[in-house]
Amino acid sequence: MAFRQALQLAACGLAGGSAAVLFSAVAVGKPRAGGDADTRTTEPLAWTGARPGHGVWDSNWDRREPLSLINLKKRNVEFGEDELASRLDHYKAKATRHIFLIRHSQYNVDGSMEKDRTLTPLGREQAELTGIRLASLGLKFNKIVHSSMTRAVETTDIISKHLPGVCRVSTDLLREGAPIEPDPPVSHWKPEAVQYYEDGARIEAAFRNYIHRADAKQEEDSYEIFICHANVIRYIVCRALQFPPEGWLRLSLNNGSITHLVIRPNGRVALRTLGDTGFMPPDKITRS
């Protein structure tokens, strides 16, 4: 009886949280009143839903908590506690995902068009060093997913030489952009409100698509590389750790740096390293 009551309480909590979450990610980075005015909206971001209180971990952050995947309306009618336990086990993740987020190497910032913003000679050296470092870890990487922007593609080309046989996939979701208005604001970088509105939805979609606990069918731990951009990585780190996403600009990442996130089967997330470039000589480290 106690088991049934506990399940009912947990089910109500998870169901309520799931129902409150809207997949209208376009609300991320909602424009400020009056364009560049400092007045901030008090409307919560769409992806936050009914989040727990400050400092409380949301165990169903990726909407893959086993209990939330069961049709609770049918539970009492079609199956009992034994069947419920079996279904929970069916949806339960078994493997750990290791996410390696790589920032692209130094590039020509003066290129008039995106295709002209190619890696500098130093940037190519940085990519070589990053590739060597990843290969030295001795891990069986499952795939490389990279931004479709030129500097990310060229970084991937070089790193891939050190990881033969690892498949690579290009995506527009990981392209650089303005994820959400930073807090505190900065004076040297002020995108238009519409850029936050458009880029924010895309980058949030990238987070939801790629950052989550392993599928229940995955039997072994996976090691995945994502080669993209500083803003995207910093936003993803904040979201994954359930830190305020507006704080993304407080983090700093060097070119070619390695950030390592771990997502456990129970949905817990840990940050192993942030922006590691300790494998590069000091004179090879840049942030441009």
UniProtKB/Swiss-Prot annotation:
Chain segments annotated as transmembrane: 7-29
Residues on Mitochondrial matrix side: 1-6
Modified residues (Phosphoserine): S86
Localization terms from the record: Mitochondrion outer membrane; Mitochondrion inner membrane
Disulfide feature: none
InterPro entries in the record: His_Pase_superF_clade-1, His_PPase_superfam, Mito_Ser/Thr_phosphatase
Residues that bear N6-acetyllysine: K115, K143, K190
GO cellular component: mitochondrial inner membrane; mitochondrial outer membrane; mitochondrion
Positions of the UniProt region annotated as Interaction with KEAP1: 76-81
UniProt GO molecular function: GTPase activator activity; phosphoprotein phosphatase activity; protein serine/threonine phosphatase activity; protein-containing complex binding
Main location: mitochondrion
PANTHER family with a match to the protein in the record: PHOSPHOGLYCERATE MUTASE-RELATED (PTHR20935), SERINE_THREONINE-PROTEIN PHOSPHATASE PGAM5, MITOCHONDRIAL (PTHR20935:SF0)
Similarity annotation: Belongs to the phosphoglycerate mutase family. BPG-dependent PGAM subfamily.
Function per UniProt: Mitochondrial serine/threonine phosphatase that dephosphorylates various substrates and thus plays a role in different biological processes including cellular senescence or mitophagy. Modulates cellular senescence by regulating mitochondrial dynamics. Mechanistically, participates in mitochondrial fission through dephosphorylating DNM1L/DRP1. Additionally, dephosphorylates MFN2 in a stress-sensitive manner and consequently protects it from ubiquitination and degradation to promote mitochondrial network formation.
Record protein name field: Serine/threonine-protein phosphatase PGAM5, mitochondrial
